Amino acid sequence: MDDYEKLLERAIDQLPPEVFETKRFEVPKAYSVIQGNRTFIQNFREVADALNRDPQHLLKFLLRELGTAGNLEGGRAILQGKFTHFLINERIEDYVNKFVICHECNRPDTRIIREGRISLLKCEACGAKAPLKNV
């Protein structure tokens, strides 16, 4: 039993410090403005940076989910069509649940890696890997 406790302590010492942090992750809110028949997400780059994701990946997901065309210009995204900030933020929440939060430990400390033709969500906190659907 003594050996078990020593091994357990050794294993705990080898874990990264992020595992023991208990801060809550808050999804950043997108600030959008509708002008004519276009919607501008003013803080798009900040949202992507807060999620630690490539802005192109996030934009591709949003465009597919909203069923529209659009592009990045500077730090903002331009979408063809009128979309409320409520709808945009709801889709960003979906993105976070599918492509940011770890499926094992529910932490946002992840990154997307590719192994061959497969995209994987790799957790920096617990080390878990989970396959992702392509955007």
Curated annotation (Swiss-Prot):
Superkingdom classification of source: Archaea
Database matches in InterPro entries: IF2/IF5, TIF2_bsu_arc, Transl_init_fac_IF2/IF5_dom, Transl_init_fac_IF2/IF5_N, Transl_init_fac_IF2/IF5_Zn-bd
Keyword set, alphabetical order: Initiation factor, Protein biosynthesis
Example GO molecular function: translation initiation factor activity
One Pfam family linked to the record: eIF-5_eIF-2B
Quaternary structure note: Heterotrimer composed of an alpha, a beta and a gamma chain.
HAMAP family, per database record: eIF_2_beta
Family, similarity comment: Belongs to the eIF-2-beta/eIF-5 family.
Function text: eIF-2 functions in the early steps of protein synthesis by forming a ternary complex with GTP and initiator tRNA.
Name used for this protein in its record: Translation initiation factor 2 subunit beta
Organism of derivation: Methanothermobacter thermautotrophicus (strain ATCC 29096 / DSM 1053 / JCM 10044 / NBRC 100330 / Delta H)
Taxonomic lineage from the root: Archaea, Methanobacteriati, Methanobacteriota, Methanomada group, Methanobacteria
